[in-house]
């Protein structure tokens, strides 16, 4: 595994920590590296709260180390003012040397604008590092912005003879414990059931 991929794996681990708290925003993690050492980490923790890049920058003990550092983030830094200021501007302000991204943000408010802003400021940008893993992590976000519909999971349990309930409507589990655990996990990840 390449060095960029190793740090991106860590970004994705951090991003997962936002599960259940950031929707409809995507799950995003950020790792800041200087001279081969991680100097800062962060993730988007709560909808409406600071983005991963802000939390990572704030975790750096000596912000002078940010100049020339490499920032790993699984989704393109935003370039618009929403509930928070643009993350691309923050990275430019701190004169980072390079930004490594898993996925371009397909939200029409961003959609490559963050990358353009970084490049225009002279920051090197590497894209598509572990892009498939990034898309899988944020498949709900990408489905919403690319297909203008929610991500859909169909869960169905039936007996071997095709029924979904007993003839007297008495309650009885059809699915097994393992299946119920998977469904419980799905429900914790979705915005509606």
Placement of each model-derived feature along the sequence:
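Local cysteine-cluster metal-coordination motifs and their immediate loop/turn environment
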Residues: 43, 50-54, 71-90
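Zinc-dependent deaminase
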Residues: 1-21, 38, 63, 82-193
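A structural motif shared across PLP-dependent enzymes of the aminotransferase-like
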Residues: 20-23, 27, 48-50
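A short, polar/charged loop-to-alpha-helix boundary motif
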Residues: 45-58, 175-181
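A short, small-residue-rich loop immediately preceding and capping a beta-strand
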Residues: 66-75, 99
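Acidic, glycine-enriched active-site microenvironments
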Residues: 2, 23-28, 67-69
